A protein has these predicted regions:
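Loop-to-helix entry region of an early transmembrane alpha helix in multi-pass inner-membrane enzymes
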Residues: 100-112, 116, 124-142
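Membrane-interface alpha helices of multi-pass inner-membrane proteins
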Residues: 200-214, 220-228, 246, 332
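Specific aromatic-rich, kink-prone transmembrane helix
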Residues: 146, 182-202, 352-356
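Transmembrane-helix signature of polytopic, membrane-embedded enzymes
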Residues: 130, 147-168, 184-185, 201
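Perimembrane helix-loop-helix junctions
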Residues: 3-5, 191, 195, 218-245
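Interfacial juxtamembrane loops and adjacent helix segments
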Residues: 53-107
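Hydrophobic, aromatic-rich transmembrane alpha-helices
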Residues: 297-324, 328-332
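Short acidic/glycine- and proline-prone juxtamembrane loop motifs at membrane-interface regions
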Residues: 172-182, 342-343
Length: 372
């Protein structure tokens, strides 16, 4: 009996060819079309700020890049000229006042490795705004390669993996304006290396992931605790690495950002005009309100379907149990700490669950003696 995909990673059967073609087509599509949200100008501003210190020059270069490179349909929204809302008035004020614009940059500078990735792509000759699409698309290609490799290692169905590439959750990462795709690439690569390459490589990638998104330090700590408990990492080494993981977001927030209280207040309560002089206020009552809103958003998303797949994969694919458990714990902890539910924040959970489901599909097919 022959199954697709076969176990050998270099044996390009029909499913592998389809997967490769689909990856290339989607990669080109994601290079051409990015969401370009209102965060675009702040990320571009942070790249400019690596080379220029004058707030006026930073504002001018950032908005010039947006108006000349971004699709015409999204430019009015980024500038705040399309609506009469409070949020739009803030965007207009940022555009008009370079010093006010500069006050918003620290909210986005706390993803330093992502900013450096944009800068590297820009130095290669790509426009400032287009660099965002390139980093997201390249991250997609990396994730697609890891998914294919992992599914093969598990003896899973590459046909099912083809479906994964077409999901809205994958598109959100591949077309997103921000570090989410790159963040999941580091986390997924680290997780895969822990089990199927070398733990040292996996730990290195996980440590680096915190410089893409600081909250990834939570996942790194969970992985280090697992390795220490399994005897794969000496206790003293685990303690040192956990300390580094914990100190990383502290160091990032010390040199950039306004702190957690300001972030919570900015996200869940206010749209402040001048965050540099804004006094944040966030109470327990505010947190509970945000938590209830986050739960409602989660219940109206695809999360429930993925949780069912997560439970199924946990039961049917023994080799994926610890990766699934670590991703589940990480996602739960992240939601409790920061209950702003957006699918892009939980990309790792979605992808690892889907990889487990690809293996579960093949295991059920094999148990019923069906050739795929």
């Amino acid at each position: 009996m022959v199954y697709f995909p076969v176990a050998h990673p270099y044996d390009m059967k029909a499913s592998g060819v389809v997967y490769l073609v689909l990856t290339v087509v989607l990669f080109i599509h994601f290079l051409r079309y990015n969401n370009y949200t209102t965060d675009t100008v702040e990320f571009v501003g942070n790249v400019v700020a690596l080379h220029v210190s004058d707030p006026v020059a930073i504002r001018d270069l950032a908005y010039r890049a947006v108006t000349t490179e971004a699709p015409a349909m999204v430019v009015p929204h980024i500038l705040g000229t399309d609506l009469a809302t409070e949020e739009a008035s803030v965007r207009r004020a940022k555009h008009a006042d370079p010093y006010r614009f500069a006050q918003f940059l620290p909210y986005f500078s706390v993803k330093p490795l992502y900013i450096e990735a944009l800068n590297l792509v820009h130095k290669a000759g790509v426009g400032l705004v287009r660099s965002i699409a390139v980093v997201s698309a390249v991250s997609f290609a990396g994730m697609a390669a890891l998914i294919y490799w992992w599914v093969l290692k598990l003896g899973g169905s590459v046909w099912a993996a083809c479906v994964l590439l077409l999901t809205p959750e994958m598109s959100a990462l591949a077309q997103g304006t921000g570090p989410d795709g790159l963040s999941v690439l580091f986390l997924l690569g680290g997780l895969f290396c822990l089990w199927d390459v070398r733990p040292s490589v996996g730990v290195t990638l996980l440590l680096l992931s915190a410089w893409v998104r600081p909250e990834n330090a939570i996942f790194c700590i969970l992985a280090l605790l697992y390795l220490a408990a399994k005897g794969q990492l000496r206790v003293w080494m685990a303690v040192v690495l956990i300390g580094i993981s914990a100190l990383t977001p502290m160091a990032i927030n010390h040199f950039g950002g306004y702190g957690w209280k300001a972030l919570y207040s900015h996200t869940f309560k206010f749209t402040e005009m001048e965050p540099g002089i804004f006094v944040p206020a966030f109470t327990v009552s505010d947190y509970l309100h945000a938590l209830r809103s986050g739960v409602r958003e989660a219940l109206h998303s695809s999360l429930i379907a993925y949780l069912l797949l997560w439970i199924t994969s946990l039961r049917l694919v023994p080799r994926m149990r610890w990766p699934l458990l670590l991703c589940g714990l990480f996602s739960a902890a992240k939601f409790v700490i920061y209950p702003n539910f957006e699918p892009r924040y939980y990309g790792l959970l979605y992808l690892v669950t889907a990889i487990g489901a690809c293996a579960a599909v093949q295991s059920k097919v094999a148990s019923h003696g069906v050739t795929t």
